[in-house]
Each structure stands twice: as structure tokens, then as C-alpha cells.
Amino acid sequence: TPLQYEVDGKKYFNERPTSTQQTGFSYVAQLRSWLPRELGGILWFGNDDGNMIAYVPIYCSNTERAECFNTPGADAVTFSDKNAFWVCNWVSNMVYPRYSQLFPSLKAVRDSLENAYFAAQPEVEAKALSLYKTDKSAAVKYLNDYSIQKSNEMLARWKQLAIYLIVKYNDMAGETGKES
């Protein structure tokens, strides 16, 4: 494998990178024992290459998924622009061959989304904790709705990014002299 190799009879290995083109999904678990279980666990989840996605907050108490992560009709061979895997994969596959040109646009959108999620987290969780003290199910619903909203927001921004990349970097862009 590319992670293990031999040179002059000596064996070497590389650690597996966290961001590779064959990644189907990845997540970062954020676990806080000082919060109630329903609030303390978040999976920062994303479909496709870890460097080319915006991780969205999925609270561990969620009981429903955003449609973009459970899209009827979408599968490994059926594209859907309502499906996060397909849209994120579409964008990544546009970026790979022209990484130095396209990645800065992707990074700007990715960082904008993630920074907004991180900035909102204290307020969102303060509200959830307040709800939790009087109505546990209301707190769970609030976080579930928040996760779905942020998942849908990510998908919408990624679709916009895909269209932007196609228009800005199409093979005619240099000839027209216009930047879209």
C-alpha cells in the first residue's frame, strides 16, 4: 500500500492522512462530560474529502437527520443535488485537477460556514441548556432542528459554490476576459 513501502531492504510507513480523495465521510467527535448527555456530544460531520468540506454540527441527541444525509433515491450510482455526499463530491472533483486555482474559493466558503457554526455554538448551547432545565424534549428538538438547519445551509452554500466554480473557471472564462 502507499502507506507501507520498502527501500533497500528497509521497511517504511506513512501515517494515513486525514484528508484523502477516497474519503466517503468523516467526523470529529466533540464530547463534553460537564454538559448533559443530550447537549454534550456533537459529531462535526461531513461527506467527502475532509479538507474540502464544511463540518456541520450534529448533536448526539438528534432523532432525525437532514434530508441531505438521508436522501430518497440517492445512492452510490444515482446523483441527487439534494444529497450532501453527491454535492460535496461534485465540488471536490472539480477542485482536484485545478487545486491551486479553485481551492481558495472552496476554502473561503468552508471557513465562512465553520467559523459561523463555532461562533454560534455558545449561544445555541446556552439556549439548549436553559430549555433542558425545564423541558428536556424541547432542548433535544431545538438542537435537532438546529443541526438540520445547518446541514441544509451547508448544502445550499455548496451548490452555490459548485455553480460559481463552473462559471468562473469554465474553458471560456479566459477568452471573454470576464470574471463571473
Give the ranges of each region predicted by the language model:
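C-terminus-biased signal that marks the final domain/tail of proteins
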Residues: 1-180
